[in-house]
Amino acid sequence: MTGPTSPASTQPRVPDSHLDPLTRPLHGVLTTMMPDGQPQSSLVWVDYDGECALVNTTRQRRKGRNIEFNPRVSLLIVDPADTGRFIQIRGLAELVEDGALEHLDRLTRKYTSHPCYYGFVYPVEQQALETRVTCHIHATRVTLDAIHA
């Protein structure tokens, strides 16, 4: 498990004005750091548990491997109905295996009309080849657009 270095109680909070981009089915861009220091960005499904922004990946995918190497990440979500409205969460990512498949299936229902990920969105055979993790992003900084902040 990759964990944050700062206690959750001191992390910046997402203001009520910008909770909806985290709870609506809007896509985010998660940026992680490659071992050579180059940024790597991925389009991701996003969730929020009241403390952390959540995304789902595998330990085998590039973003999962990058987080294992360096837990510093950035998540950007832009409201497609008002592209001047956004939230950026910078922080430390914690990869958690427990409950990750259930989290992925919740995201699948949120973002698609399918009941679960494997067998509908992705081949069921792939499930045995992957170790699913929920990426908990412990915020060190929350940035909002200036217009709606």
What are these regions (language model features)?
Residues 24-25, 70, 131, 140:
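Structured helix-beta-strand junction loops
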Residues 19-20, 45, 65, 125-127:
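Short secondary-structure boundary/capping segments
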Residues 2-13, 80, 85-149:
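Charged, gly/pro-rich active-site loop segments
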Residues 14-18, 63, 103:
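Hydrophobic alpha-helical segments typical of transmembrane helices
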Residues 18, 26, 51, 85, ...:
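A generic secondary-structure signal marking the coil-to-beta-strand transition
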Residues 25-59, 65-67, 73-77, 86-89:
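Short beta-strand segments
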Residues 25, 71, 107-111:
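Alpha-helix boundary/capping residues
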Residues 2-33:
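Short, conserved active-site entrance elements at the starts or edges of catalytic domains
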